[in-house]
């Protein structure tokens, strides 16, 4: 999800990539080798694994669910899952894949912009993976966080994984992406009535994030080969060091809960 005109962007991207393989190019990085996106997914899953736990029957909201990769994981673990996304194609594929996985009875998928979210439910877990980094307008970003806080049950937990480096940098920013400084998110969450329970690292190895702006300039074959090599070098470091090298991590997993009531 991103700013007001971005739903068309995500729909075009979904139509092009969502039904290819696992659909990672639709929700991670398109134009990159498959190994690159699989490495991203591995580091994300490693970071989420400690916190993505709940009782059977727990109500889980997956915002910006894409093709439903985290939605299916939650439903397979016994959650009653609601997934939302601005792309009708993404939502359709997520529903289709939940059916083929035999978990359709525990899943519902809705075409919905997070900024305008207004469901009658409150959720034990609200999950968002690389969603806020695509909401560029500050007012819409704050509204999105408030909407999630308002849908979180009183004793619920919120997991938000975003590009959030400790030091400010714009070298990877684009028309649909912003890597905001970590302290910006921390203040935003506090302002929206949330308490930060923990911050976990995701990808502290510097090779990929330092090299990415330059790798994109290489010719096609060289770009794919070099990106795969850099990802392969980064992955062991990311998986091994992420729990401890939090300040060095490009992405961060924020573990949040109510601090006594979110603003209306």
Briefly describe each language-model feature range.
Residues 203-264:
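A C-terminal cap/extension of S-adenosyl-L-methionine-dependent methyltransferases
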Residues 135, 168-184:
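Acceptor-substrate binding/catalytic loop of class I
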Residues 127:
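A conserved beta-strand element that flanks and buttresses the S-adenosyl-L-methionine
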Residues 1-54, 57-64:
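Conserved class I S-adenosyl-L-methionine
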Residues 155-162:
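Conserved beta-strand signature within the Rossmann-like core of class I S-adenosyl-L-methionine
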């Amino acid at each position: 999800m991103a700013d007001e005109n971005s739903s068309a962007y995500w729909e075009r991207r979904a139509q092009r990539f969502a039904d290819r393989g696992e659909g990672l190019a639709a929700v991670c990085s398109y134009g990159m080798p498959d190994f690159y996106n699989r490495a991203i997914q591995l580091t994300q899953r490693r970071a989420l694994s400690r916190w993505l736990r709940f009782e059977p029957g727990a109500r889980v909201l997956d915002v910006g669910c894409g093709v439903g990769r985290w939605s299916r994981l939650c439903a397979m673990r016994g959650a009653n899952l609601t997934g939302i996304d601005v792309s009708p194609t993404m939502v359709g594929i997520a529903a289709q894949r939940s059916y083929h996985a035999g978990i359709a009875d525990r899943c519902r998928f809705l075409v919905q912009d997070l900024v305008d979210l207004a469901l009658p439910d409150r959720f034990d877990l609200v999950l968002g993976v690389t969603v806020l980094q695509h909401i560029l307008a500050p007012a819409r970003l704050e509204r999105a966080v408030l909407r999630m806080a308002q849908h979180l049950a009183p004793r619920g937990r919120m997991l938000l994984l975003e590009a959030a480096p400790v030091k400010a940098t714009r070298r990877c920013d684009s028309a649909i992406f912003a890597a905001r400084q970590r302290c910006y998110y921390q203040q935003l969450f506090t302002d929206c009535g949330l308490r930060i329970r923990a911050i976990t690292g995701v990808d502290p190895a510097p090779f990929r994030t330092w090299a990415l702006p330059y790798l994109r300039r290489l010719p096609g074959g060289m770009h794919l080969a070099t990106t795969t090599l850099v990802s392969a070098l980064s992955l062991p470091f990311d998986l091994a060091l992420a729990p401890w090298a939090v300040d060095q991590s490009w992405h961060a997993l924020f573990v949040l809960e109510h601090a006594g009531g979110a603003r209306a």
